[in-house]
Structures are given as structure tokens and as C-alpha cells.
Regions:
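Helix-loop-helix hairpins and the membrane-proximal interhelical loops
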Residues: 1-31
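C-terminal membrane-solvent junction of multi-pass transporters and transport-like membrane proteins
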Residues: 134, 138-146, 150-172, 177, ...
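Helix-loop junctions at the membrane interface of multi-pass solute transporters
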Residues: 36-41, 46-59, 65-70, 86
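Low-complexity, proline/glycine-enriched hydrophobic segments characteristic of transmembrane helices
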Residues: 88-216
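A generic transmembrane alpha-helix motif of multi-pass inner-membrane proteins
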Residues: 23, 30, 256-259, 263-310, ...
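Selective recognition of specific alpha-helical transmembrane segments in multi-pass small-molecule
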Residues: 1, 59-89, 260-268
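Transmembrane helix-loop junctions in multi-pass membrane proteins
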Residues: 1-2, 83-95, 182-183, 201-225, ...
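Hydrophobic alpha-helical transmembrane segments of multi-pass small-molecule transporters/permeases
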Residues: 28, 32-36, 67-70, 195, ...
């Protein structure tokens, strides 16, 4: 069924099913390539830093080993994750969750998911085809409930349902919230931070967590993602620290490595409580900044690479 849904729905426009708004082939392709490049680091020049440290007499053979990494990262791991999401059906369902501020948008005007015209209008807005006006003003909140009736609240590209405004530890908020160009300006009080909860679609790790809970492990399945992320984060932290260490040493010398380490640690601290949408956006920008100069270098050295590969295969054929 998972494979069938991939091919049967690719051009069918079932994007609005279950509240999932604005998902087309172009959008899915864009996100797929984006996440794929982020997962396997293709063309970014990071893996060669690690492979350059390997003790080998043949650089081409080391390159062949490196080719296996994108296959495992993208084709195997990402495909399995996608099939888990499709087979579980969680990608179409709304779950109770804490809204991320960067994923929350307030539209001017009341649009309802039960109304086909309203749903279509919001879907076109999410796609960027026919933008709807963003709301600017104030939201009146009483006992956690937003009293304004002339707005539409979206979260994670879906209609937000059963929205409640809370502060501190699950205390219902009463007061006024400012909204500017569709973005809610939440008070950032350290002891009583204001936030929104409700039902909406999920993405990233929370979506995968819900999907694994639908498997034969039941609620125990939710621990697969945190454990996997722990291992991934630990290995990524070490690897990228080494990559940056080598790059800084090459560009400016060893005396600047300590400064790099401090910036690196501060970056991890800030990212730990930043909305994942912001993190994904920043990662996309930095990936482009890494990839462009590296691809230029590959183009300039393509003759040398081709010559080395041809010589490698010639020697391999002679051995056979």
C-alpha cells in the first residue's frame, strides 16, 4: 500500500487530505532534494576531509567507498523512513502538540477546513499561488481560548484545531497577544513563557515518533527516534567538529582552532532550543554556501579526476 500510494498520488493532487495543505509534486520534490542533500552531504566537500585522513595507496578506491555513503543515507534510510510514515498514516493525521512559533501563521479572514472553497483558498496560499492577507492586530485570549472570530490559524501547513494559549506549566493564559504580518509575538518571560497548543499535522522527529508508535512495538516504538537521534547527534557532533577543525587549520592556522571550538559549542547551545523550521532554513543556506565553491573546484579538477579514475579501472582490469 505504501508503494502504491507513492505512485498513485504523485500527480493526483490529494494534498488537502487530512488537512495537509499545499503539497504538490514540485513542493515534494523540492523538500525531498533539500533533505536528501542535507542527509548525505552530496557535493559539499565534507566527506573528503574524513577520507583524506585514511591510510590508503589508492585515492580512487577510497572514493569508491565514499560513494556508498549517499546510497545508505538517502536511498536506504530515507526510503525506509518514508515507507514507515506512509504505512502508518500519521502524515495525514493531526496530533496534539506544542506549536512552534516559526510554524504558526495567522491569516486575516475566517476559513474553515470543512468548507471546500475555504480549504482550497488556504491551500493555494500555502503553495504561494494566491497569497491571502496576513493578520495584523491583537488577539484577545480568555482562559486559553482565542476570542477573535475573523482569523484563521495555521500550523505546520495545516489548519490548527482546538487551539489553547498557555503559559508556564500548563496554565491557561488570559490577556492580549500582538500579531504582526501573521506572526504572533509571544511574551518571552523566563518563568511564565507563553505558548500555543492544539491539534495539527507534525513534521520532523515528532512525526516519525508518532509513526513508530503505530508499529508492533506500540508505545515503546516512540523511543526508537530519540535513541537514533542521540546516536546521530553524537556522531555528527564529533564529525563536524573535526571537519571544521581541519578547515580552520588549513585556512588560518592552529592558533584559531580554539576560537572555532567556542563558536561551535555556542552554536549547538543556541540550536537546542530554536524552532526546527529556523534550523532547517539556516541549514539550507549553509549547505548552499558550502556546495557552490566545492562544485566549482570539482569542475576545475574534472580532468584530473577523470584521468585518475580511468587509470584505476585500467589497473583493475589488468589484475583480473
Amino acid at each position: 500500500p505504501s508503494f502504491i500510494s507513492v505512485f498513485s498520488n504523485i500527480f493526483s493532487g490529494t494534498a488537502a487530505t487530512g488537512g495537509f495543505l499545499g503539497a504538490t509534486v514540485v513542493w515534494a520534490f523540492n523538500r525531498g532534494v533539500n533533505r536528501g542533500l542535507f542527509s548525505n552531504e552530496a557535493g559539499q566537500g565534507s566527506a573528503p576531509i574524513a577520507h583524506a585522513a585514511a591510510k590508503t595507496e589508492e585515492p580512487v578506491s577510497e572514493g569508491m567507498v565514499a560513494l556508498l555513503e549517499p546510497f545508505i543515507d538517502t536511498i536506504v534510510i530515507c526510503s525506509i523512513t518514508g515507507l514507515v510514515l506512509l504505512s502508518s498514516g500519521t502524515w495525514l493525521k493531526k496530533f496534539e502538540n506544542k506549536f512552534q512559533q516559526a510554524d504558526t501563521v495567522v491569516l486575516s479572514g475566517a476559513y474553515h477546513e470543512s468548507d471546500p472553497d475555504g480549504k482550497s483558498a488556504v491551500s493555494e496560499h500555502v503553495l504561494g499561488n494566491k497569497p491571502l492577507p496576513f493578520y495584523t492586530g491583537s488577539l484577545e485570549v480568555r482562559n486559553g481560548q482565542i476570542l477573535n472570530t475573523d482569523i484563521t490559524l495555521l500550523h505546520a501547513r495545516s489548519f490548527a484545531d482546538s487551539v489553547r494559549v498557555k503559559e508556564g506549566k500548563e496554565v491557561l493564559f488570559s490577556g492580549t497577544l500582538s500579531v504582526r504580518d501573521g506572526r504572533i509575538e509571544l511574551p518571552m518571560n523566563k518563568e511564565r513563557a507563553v505558548y500555543l497548543t492544539g491539534k495539527s499535522l507534525l513534521h520532523s522527529a515528532p512525526l516519525s515518533t508518532e509513526a513508530f508508535k503505530k508499529g508492533f512495538l506500540g508505545d515503546w516504538g516512540q523511543f526508537i527516534i530519540p535513541f537514533s537521534l542521540l546516536l546521530f547527534a553524537f556522531s555528527t557532533t564529533i564529525a563536524w567538529s573535526y571537519y571544521g577543525d581541519r578547515a580552520v587549520t588549513y585556512l588560518w592556522g592552529t592558533k584559531y582552532v580554539r576560537i572555532y571550538h567556542v563558536i561551535y559549542i555556542v552554536g549547538f547551545f543556541l540550536a537546542s532550543f530554536t524552532d526546527t523550521t529556523i534550523v532547517w532554513t539556516l541549514s539550507g543556506i549553509t549547505v548552499a554556501l558550502m556546495t557552490l565553491p566545492n562544485l566549482i573546484g570539482i569542475l576545475l579538477l574534472h580532468k584530473e579526476v577523470k584521468s585518475s579514475v580511468n587509470e584505476y579501472w585500467r589497473r583493475m582490469k589488468e589484475k583480473l
